[in-house]
Amino acid sequence: MRKKFKRQEYARYKKLGEKWRRPRGRTSKMRRYEKGKPAMPAIGYRKPSEVRGLHPSGYEDVLVSNMRELEALDPEKQAARIASAVGARKKTLMLEKARELGIKVLNP
């Protein structure tokens, strides 16, 4: 599970969101990496290159907008995400075809 980096003093002021912002204050303890203060993002928290960019299920996320693109997928490594431009009628046909081919659909 990824580490959640939160904004400095986000809990102290209601108007501050949790979204990460780099601390830039001159005397900021967080900026100076003092012990007992929240961690800041660093290159060491990066994911391993084998899983970087993959869907949490472990499949490569591929956007498909027609049957030909769906049939070209590798069911072992890739999962389909049906484009929003595809209508309901075509989407049901694509879902049936994906079930036949054993392809995982990320947005059924």
UniProtKB/Swiss-Prot annotation:
It comes from Methanothermobacter thermautotrophicus (strain ATCC 29096 / DSM 1053 / JCM 10044 / NBRC 100330 / Delta H). GO terms for molecular function: structural constituent of ribosome. This is Large ribosomal subunit protein eL32. Belongs to the eukaryotic ribosomal protein eL32 family. One of its GO terms (cellular component) is cytosolic large ribosomal subunit. Residues 21-44 are annotated as: Disordered. The gene is rpl32e. Pfam families: Ribosomal_L32e. PROSITE patterns: RIBOSOMAL_L32E (PS00580). The keyword Ribonucleoprotein applies. Keywords: Ribonucleoprotein, Ribosomal protein. InterPro entries: Ribosomal_eL32, Ribosomal_eL32_arc, Ribosomal_eL32_CS, Ribosomal_eL32_sf. The keyword Ribonucleoprotein applies. One of its GO terms (biological process) is translation. Residues 21-30 have a biased composition (Basic residues).
